[in-house]
Amino acid sequence: MGWITEDLIRRNAEHNDCVIFSLEELSLHQQEIERLEHIDKWCRDLKILYLQNNLIGKIENVSKLKKLEYLNLALNNIEKIENLEGCEELAKLDLTVNFIGELSSIKTLKHNIHLKELFLMGNPCAFFDHYREFVVATLPQLKWLDGKGIEPSERIKALQEYSIIEPQIREQEKDHCLKRAKLKEEAQRKHQEEDKNEDKRSNAGFDGRWYTDINATLSSLESKDHLQAPDTEEHNTKKLDNSEDDLEFWNKPCLFTPESRLETLRHMEKQRKNQEKLSERKKKVKPPRTLITEDGKALNVNEPKIDFSLKDNEKQIILDLAVYRYMDTSLINVDVQPTYVRVMIKGKPFQLVLPAEVKPDSSSAKRSQTTGHLVICMPKVGEVITGGQRAFTSVKTTSDRSREHINTRSKHMEKLEVDPSKHSFPDVTNIVQGKKHTPRRRPEPKIIPSEEDPTFEDNPEVPPLI
């Protein structure tokens, strides 16, 4: 059974950003509502209200809806028109396929001066003699009745015959009320009998008395395994009983009354509960997914079963996940570790062991707006950023250099008596080489006497000719 709650109204007010007090249109159809309540307090600005296909038995708590223009109460359990005088702007009222037998109750709609359309087809009163004439004469403001227009000549004839039609309508109402009283009594009896039958079925095999037999105790204990039926057999018998009851209920003829509608709803609820119990039994608790073993080893897991591609470059590792295109990004959680990457997609883990160690703090995750794919870029360890470009260089520490030096020395076999020139240690005496000092002044040119002139005398005071 359904009730009108604040949460129900908010869920049906998405077109108004889930704001209740300013609602102008509200649809609460097929909610199994039994009673009208709270709407006149929470939604006073309503203009259109849909309540068709529910279990409402009485029109109530709508008198404060002064702006209401259209009220749809089709396919309910209403037996009388009442409590609509306060709906001053009501222009259209739909009461199709209800159980209205008191046709004289439409007189309460005289105060609704803006009422133009009224639907009463499918009600017991619609089968009364002179039903249309009575309604047309009683409500002069009506323009349409059951989807058919009212002409002025039809209204004049109805007003002329109103004094004759009214007592006939009263008699038909009395007959209908007597029939309804009998049907209610029969429905109560059937309901009590069904309750008794259910109690008997639940206590089957027990007549209210306890028996003790000392001689039978040993034999009963010995044959205990044979007497206990397995769970599967009990489940099958219960299933057969439920199917038989279901067939019996749906094949049983019944009248179309408010009680029969309630009975069918209760039966459907019972079936629903039984199915939920069966589904809960069938559900097996799945063991938790192991992502990391006891020894700390990460495993490859693809529980969401999505496609992916892994690219291993010199500088970084790129993981491309084919995430669903229209899935919200808030449902994705990425966790990058040095040796593996884990992505939670709607609570399902995707884990992949990486071929090389990466930097989690330098990693990035981006999602495509066109395809929805998730691309995770994870730079490898040892990456150095220089001049706006990335270069992959191996960084050597002092410990690595010392190891290399030791390895080179170990390759050459050393003996006690070796040639000093081939010694691996450097010669300290030849570290600094002596420098030769050269004169800064130019050397004086030598004067060679000419062989041609024997009388030539060289004067040292005379500068040489250039």
Curated annotation (Swiss-Prot):
Residue ranges, annotated region (Disordered): 185-206, 269-288, 418-466
GO cellular component terms listed in the entry, alphabetical order: cilium; cytoplasm
Domain annotation LRRCT: ranges: 123-161
Alphabetical GO biological process terms: outer dynein arm assembly
Keyword Coiled coil (UniProt): yes
Biased composition (Basic and acidic residues): 185-202, 269-279
Compositional bias annotation for Acidic residues: 450-460
UniProt keyword terms in alphabetical order: Cell projection, Cilium, Coiled coil, Cytoplasm, Leucine-rich repeat, Repeat
Matching Pfam families: CS_DNAAF11_C, LRR_9
Domain spans labelled CS: 301-396
Coiled-coil regions listed: 178-204
Compartmental location: Cytoplasm; Cell projection, Cilium
UniProt key word Repeat: yes
Positions annotated as LRR repeat: 22-43, 45-66, 67-88, 89-110
Function: May play a role in dynein arm assembly, hence essential for proper axoneme building for cilia motility.
Alphabetical list of PANTHER family matching this protein: CILIA- AND FLAGELLA-ASSOCIATED PROTEIN 410-RELATED, LEUCINE RICH REPEAT PROTEIN
Entry similarity comment: Belongs to the tilB family.
Subunit note: Interacts (via CS domain) with ZMYND10 (via C-terminus).
Protein name: Protein tilB homolog
Annotated gene: LRCC6
